[in-house]
């Protein structure tokens, strides 16, 4: 259209709008004008390109060649040759790296007269082809998801990543209906067997990409789901009639075509119902669909009214290449109606044969031009009219974002399917009643699945290789038959039905045998079709894929960290049918995620690492564990440094620290709160009511409440051990070997006379009450130990373990860890040269507690950060955790609240200091609802109900000398607490 006429037309249309358009239609028509303006501009650009291209250059636009970014310069030279001599229209990238691909794309685009359309075959994202990029779940996994909005979000994110690396088209989604369990090529690339589910999910994935600047390509038309062979190696045959094809295979394509999908890829299939012509004598097979005009033009373009890009499947695949030579094959694909020739074997031969076909009149130049215009319109649509070189700076970080990782986690979480839960075992509850073992079949070492299970319960772990002998499997039965529950993970499976998906007969026999002695839960990290092997199991989960993410999430799901909602996308048997899956409740235990999951940018938490490393470098502590949880999710859990300054043993997350005075809230408080709820104590009761031996002393009338808030007037502490340091006294009181008299272990190979406990209590009884106001004191907690043991009719440590810690599922919360754990897991607390004359390792650091055998109300408890966080989460939940109520909400609120204006204390619990004149043990940014405690060895635990936040810091700042006060003077614990609140504020995640 001449420019003058275009100007007049546009001016007339604008005047019409000004003088005629009603107000209520103005917005609608304005949008239409914008759309028309876009079409005009697109047409202008397309026609400009057509005018400057020669007929040969137009032919070149039909080719999309294969490119790699992991090959040498010879490959790049070959691609540049195709660009410069055959004017190819695009390329599809396969294996390589994102940086090299971006660099190559920039060079290729610069060398091309017409912008290149860059594609990738990335069904599950860039990670399907490129190293060091993220892999999204495969489509069969996605088929189990019930919320299709998540697939739209996935499409959005994959499009973002594609654009960042210079890709404009993704050859996805696969919308084949997988109604053949023996399909060797589609299988887990399909959303499943239900056409409606396939269509809905295909649309969601497609629209997410298309709305964000990347063209989708629906494949493999007219449907590759019901085949028994792979078109990469042969021509598969589908013998369904036309009614079946229209009802099943074609349905998803019809739906995506109605949603204007940009591309459709035609498969190499033999479908006599669609085209029964013989491919060529003497071959008896019917025409491959890619080369069939009846399929491509008559069915897809005319009957189904598809106007987008029609793309062949790769032309080097044996499904077509075995019938025709390069060049001839490409011409036949064009004659069938395809627009883009994908992965031609020989561009030069194809180019020449197409020219010959035009010259002979087999195909007209106008037909070529029509397809080229369609290709150019697509290029304009994705912004190639204004191509800008890809910026390679920070490319890896831009691709592999935390938000993308979070989305992948959400997808997998939503897919995991609880196929059977007949005994209502999942999520696991009442852990105190269970003895649990785990078995990974198909693994040689402890799996990520098993490691994550460790965070929820005490579990004994076992492994078996799939190749192990029947005898080895039988021996494993002997190891496991005594457990009440066995969790079995099936790993390294395959998709071959003929090989029973990689599950050995011995594994099935072992599972069936164990079922008779234990409650067995099987988690299949692989094909849902393999479920047919487990018809007799009551508890069965399928995670679809075997990777670190599915393993970590499956372990959390079993223990109720999040709800299970997935449904089977295919039928494995009449019992395990499409759509089957049980729903569970979630959020009953801690979940393990990333900061972005709770609205915090992980970058803002990075100063924690710097503070911790500097503290270690400055000699404030040899090492530490730091944990942050928000909204019931652990979002930061790291260990730093070593057990000692000798750098001999690095700190691991599972290592165990002496909690010191955190014992008050993590042990004694629990017992007293239970006694309070059961009416066994009142806050204004006196000690004398429970301890008649105090009659006549100044301790008898001390009120429980006053001791809890440190206002009973007691001395801060009494160094009982100092009276035993004299050599003569020491010889009378200690032995290096335990016997019936010297039975109190105060350190390794050092035992105190058991009757010396009476001396300790007598000393406390006769001590003065010098203080009339607030004074922090340990002494009352010696008496609380006696009270609780009398109440429970057992030792304090046994009571706490049986009533609380075992129920919570903690592994490391305990007194005297030297009895249960290897010293390599226990962090030493001091090199005591004064009293114990040894490294204090696995024994309580506090001298008073040590002289009571390591169990007391004020000190003696050990833990790692995770188990302490579990306990704090129970309190943050107002007394509820793991499906069990430990305390009434009112009890927790009473004990954790401020008690009066004399101090910042709650009942046992410490609180933020409201008076700015005094030092604050917690962050000044913490809400006044926050509660917790610090510990002498360099520990703290804080929970903030207002922000649903938990902060744990464990260290051994007392090693090698308890006089080291650098941790406190540098305010390390509080600085880290500050960073957490600052991160929430900066992220607006509060």
Regions found by a protein language model. Give the residues of each.
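Short acidic, glycine-rich surface-loop motifs adjacent to enzyme active sites
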Residues: 81-98, 181, 257-287, 485-498
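A short, well-structured edge-of-sheet supersecondary motif
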Residues: 89, 262, 375, 616-650, ...
């Amino acid at each position: 259209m001449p420019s003058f006429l275009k100007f007049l037309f546009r001016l007339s249309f604008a005047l019409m709008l000004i003088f005629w358009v009603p107000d209520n239609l103005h917005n609608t028509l304005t949008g239409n004008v914008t759309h028309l303006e876009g079409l005009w501009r697109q047409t202008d650009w397309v026609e400009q390109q057509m005018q400057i291209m020669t007929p040969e250059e137009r032919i070149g636009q039909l080719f999309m060649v294969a490119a790699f970014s992991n090959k040498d310069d010879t490959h790049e030279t070959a691609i540049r040759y195709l660009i410069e001599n055959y004017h190819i229209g695009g390329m599809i990238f396969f294996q390589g790296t994102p940086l090299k691909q971006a660099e190559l794309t920039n060079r290729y685009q610069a060398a091309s007269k017409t912008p290149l359309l860059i594609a990738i075959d990335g069904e599950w994202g860039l990670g399907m082809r490129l190293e060091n990029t993220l892999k999204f779940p495969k489509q069969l996994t996605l088929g189990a998801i019930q919320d299709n909005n998540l697939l739209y979000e996935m499409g959005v994110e994959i499009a973002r990543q594609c654009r960042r690396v210079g890709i404009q088209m993704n050859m996805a989604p696969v919308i084949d209906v997988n109604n053949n369990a023996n399909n060797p090529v589609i299988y887990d690339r399909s959303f499943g067997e239900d056409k409606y589910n396939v269509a809905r999910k295909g649309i969601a994935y497609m629209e997410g990409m298309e709305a964000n600047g990347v063209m989708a390509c629906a494949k493999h038309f007219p449907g590759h789901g019901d085949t028994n062979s792979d078109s990469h190696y042969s021509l598969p045959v589908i013998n369904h009639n036309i009614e079946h094809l229209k009802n099943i295979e074609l349905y998803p394509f019809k739906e995506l075509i109605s949603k204007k999908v940009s591309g459709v890829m035609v498969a190499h299939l033999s479908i006599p119902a669609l085209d029964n012509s013989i491919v060529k004598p003497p071959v008896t097979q019917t025409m491959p669909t890619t080369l069939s005009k009846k399929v491509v033009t008559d069915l897809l373009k005319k009957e189904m009214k598809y106007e987008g890009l029609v793309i062949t499947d790769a032309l080097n695949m044996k499904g077509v290449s075995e019938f025709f030579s390069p060049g001839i094959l490409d011409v036949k694909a064009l004659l069938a109606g395809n627009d883009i020739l994908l992965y031609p074997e020989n561009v030069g031969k194809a180019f020449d044969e197409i020219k010959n076909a035009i010259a002979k009149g087999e195909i007209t130049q106008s037909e070529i031009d029509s397809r080229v215009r369609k290709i150019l319109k697509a290029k304009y649509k994705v912004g190639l009219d204004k191509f800008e070189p890809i910026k390679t700076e920070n490319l890896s970080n831009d691709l592999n974002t935390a938000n993308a990782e979070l989305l992948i986690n959400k997808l997998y979480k939503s897919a995991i399917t609880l196929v059977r839960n007949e005994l209502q075992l999942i999520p696991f509850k009442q852990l105190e009643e269970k003895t649990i073992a785990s078995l990974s079949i198909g693994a040689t070492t402890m799996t990520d699945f098993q490691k994550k299970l460790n965070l929820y319960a005490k579990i004994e772990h076992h492994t078996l290789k799939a190749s192990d002998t029947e005898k080895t499997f039988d021996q494993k039965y002997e190891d496991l038959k005594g457990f009440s529950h066995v969790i079995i993970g099936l790993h390294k499976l395959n998709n071959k039905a003929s090989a029973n998906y990689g599950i050995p007969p011995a594994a099935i026999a072992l599972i069936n045998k164990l079922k008779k002695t234990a409650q067995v839960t099987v988690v299949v990290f692989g094909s849902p079709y393999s479920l047919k092997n487990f018809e007799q199991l009551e508890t069965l989960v399928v995670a679809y894929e075997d990777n670190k993410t599915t393993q970590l999430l499956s372990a959390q799901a079993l223990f109720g960290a999040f709800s299970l909602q997935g449904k089977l996308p295919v039928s494995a048997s009449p019992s395990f049918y499409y759509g089957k899956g049980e729903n569970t409740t979630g959020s009953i235990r801690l979940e393990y995620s990333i900061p972005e999951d709770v609205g915090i940018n992980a970058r803002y938490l990075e100063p924690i690492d710097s503070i911790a490393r500097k503290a270690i470098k400055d000699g404030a502590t040899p090492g530490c564990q730091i944990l942050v949880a928000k909204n019931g999710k652990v979002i930061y859990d790291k260990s730093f440094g070593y057990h000692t300054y000798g750098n001999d043993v690095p700190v691991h997350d599972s290592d165990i620290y002496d909690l010191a005075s955190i014992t008050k809230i993590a042990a004694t408080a629990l017992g007293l709160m239970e006694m309070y709820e059961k009416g066994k104590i009142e806050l204004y009761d006196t000690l004398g009511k429970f301890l008649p031996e105090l009659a006549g002393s100044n301790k008898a009338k001390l009120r429980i409440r006053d001791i809890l808030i440190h206002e009973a007037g007691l001395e801060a502490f009494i160094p009982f051990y100092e009276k035993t340091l004299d050599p003569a006294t020491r010889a009378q009181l200690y032995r290096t070997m335990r016997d019936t008299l010297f039975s109190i272990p105060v350190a390794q190979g050092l035992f105190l006379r058991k009757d010396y406990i009476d001396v300790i209590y007598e000393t406390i009884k006769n001590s003065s009450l010098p203080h009339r106001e607030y004074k922090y004191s340990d002494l009352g907690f010696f008496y609380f130990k006696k009270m609780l043991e009398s109440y429970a009719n057992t030792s304090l440590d046994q009571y706490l373990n049986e009533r609380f810690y075992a129920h919570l599922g903690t592994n490391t919360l305990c007194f005297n860890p030297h009895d249960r754990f290897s010293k390599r897991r226990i962090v030493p607390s001091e090199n005591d040269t004064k009293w114990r004359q040894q490294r204090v390792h696995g024994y309580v650091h506090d001298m008073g507690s040590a002289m009571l055998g390591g169990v007391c109300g004020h000190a003696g408890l050990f833990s790692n950060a995770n188990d302490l966080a579990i306990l704090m989460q129970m309190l943050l939940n107002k007394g509820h955790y793991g499906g069990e109520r430990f305390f009434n909400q009112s009890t927790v609120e009473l004990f954790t609240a401020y008690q009066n204006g004399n101090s910042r204390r709650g009942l046992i619990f410490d609180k933020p200091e409201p008076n700015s004149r005094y030092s604050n043990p917690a962050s000044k940014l913490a809400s006044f609802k926050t509660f917790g405690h610090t510990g002498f060895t360099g520990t703290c635990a804080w929970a903030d109900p207002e922000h649903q936040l938990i902060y744990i810091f464990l260290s051994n700042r007392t090693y090698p000398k308890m006089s080291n006060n650098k941790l406190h003077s540098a305010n390390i614990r509080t600085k880290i607490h500050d960073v957490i609140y600052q991160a929430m504020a900066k992220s607006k995640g509060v």
